[in-house]
From Swiss-Prot:
It comes from Bartonella tribocorum (strain CIP 105476 / IBS 506). GO terms for biological process: chaperone cofactor-dependent protein refolding. Heptamer of 7 subunits arranged in a ring. Interacts with the chaperonin GroEL. The gene is groES. One of its GO terms (cellular component) is cytoplasm. It holds the Pfam family Cpn10. Its main location: cytoplasm. This is Co-chaperonin GroES. It is found in: Cytoplasm. InterPro entries: Chaperonin_GroES (IPR020818), Chaperonin_GroES_sf (IPR037124), Chaprnonin_Cpn10_CS (IPR018369), GroES-like_sf (IPR011032). Together with the chaperonin GroEL, plays an essential role in assisting protein folding. The GroEL-GroES system forms a nano-cage that allows encapsulation of the non-native substrate proteins and provides a physical environment optimized to promote and accelerate protein folding. GroES binds to the apical surface of the GroEL ring, thereby capping the opening of the GroEL channel. Belongs to the GroES chaperonin family. GO terms for molecular function: ATP binding; metal ion binding; protein folding chaperone; protein-folding chaperone binding; unfolded protein binding.
Length: 98
């Protein structure tokens, strides 16, 4: 995992997509043009948390290194240090894989 020079703010996280298999269970090879973008990723940076109504900082549940699932249209695609990454709010994350 490369060290990125970017720190997300508030309740945002930076995610690196985890590529899916190139083959189906039956052995059919899926070409890149037919693949959907993966909805699974690894958290590589997290913000400090959002402020609640009382001004208290609420820390994020996800941590750097967590493997997560997120919605198909979640996040904003960015390029940081030449790497394609996603920046999304923690609320866009559906869950942490065990």
């Amino acid at each position: 995992m490369a060290n990125i020079q970017f720190r997300p703010l508030h309740d945002r996280v930076v995610v690196r997509r985890v590529e899916s298999e190139n083959k189906t269970a039956g052995g059919i090879i899926i070409p890149d043009t037919a693949k959907e973008k993966p909805q699974e990723g690894e958290v590589i940076a997290v913000g400090n948390g959002a402020l609640d109504d009382n001004g208290k900082r609420v820390p994020l549940e996800v941590k750097t290194g967590d493997r997560i699932l997120f919605g198909k249209w979640s996040g904003t695609e960015v390029k940081i240090n030449g790497e394609d990454l996603l920046i999304m709010k923690e609320s866009d994350i559906m869950g942490i894989m065990g």
